[in-house]
């Protein structure tokens, strides 16, 4: 069974039971990238040509996605990882957590490169009511995932796990 508490018997990668999870992991590894390998000169040139409304949109996106990446990372680490038994799923989730951290580094790289007020960009998600409400909604389920130990072996525990998983993923 895929969902449940991992045991010592669940720590062997081979034989692989969930080939799809291992395939996702291998694909994720092949898609590895690093923010500082991306030259932003053309983007900076485009920035200079943007209208104030276009610049506002970029700032708004930066403000939304930067904290969102950390929320997703925490959700995976504390809300999913402990409740999936298969080591091939753990491989993929570990790589996905790395990707979320890499996205944070990418946003930081953009904030350092572009003429943006970093403090203002970091605070927008707390000041815009719709962003704040969305974040509060997600955090409610993230807390459920991280502050309580789900009785994952029970039907109710599995339902709660799936509910939390859907709530944090659909909204994000």
What residues fall within each predicted segment?
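Non-heme di-metal
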Residues: 1-172
């Amino acid at each position: 069974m895929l969902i449940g508490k991992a045991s010592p018997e669940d720590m062997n990668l081979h034989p692989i039971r969930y080939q799809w999870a291992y395939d996702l992991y291998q694909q994720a590894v092949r898609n590895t990238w690093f923010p500082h390998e991306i030259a932003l000169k053309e983007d900076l040139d485009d920035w200079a040509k943007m209208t104030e409304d276009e610049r506002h949109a970029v700032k708004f996106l930066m403000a939304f996605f930067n904290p969102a990446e950390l929320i997703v990372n925490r959700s995976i680490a504390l809300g999913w990882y402990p409740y999936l038994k298969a080591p091939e799923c753990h491989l993929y989730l570990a790589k996905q957590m790395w990707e979320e951290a890499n996205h944070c580094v990418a946003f930081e790289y953009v904030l350092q490169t572009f003429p943006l007020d970093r403090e203002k960009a970091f605070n927008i998600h707390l000041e815009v009511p719709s962003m704040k409400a969305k974040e509060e909604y997600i955090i409610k389920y993230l807390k459920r995932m991280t502050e309580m130990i789900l009785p994952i072996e029970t039907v109710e525990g599995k339902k709660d796990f799936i509910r939390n998983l859907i709530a944090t993923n659909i909204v994000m």
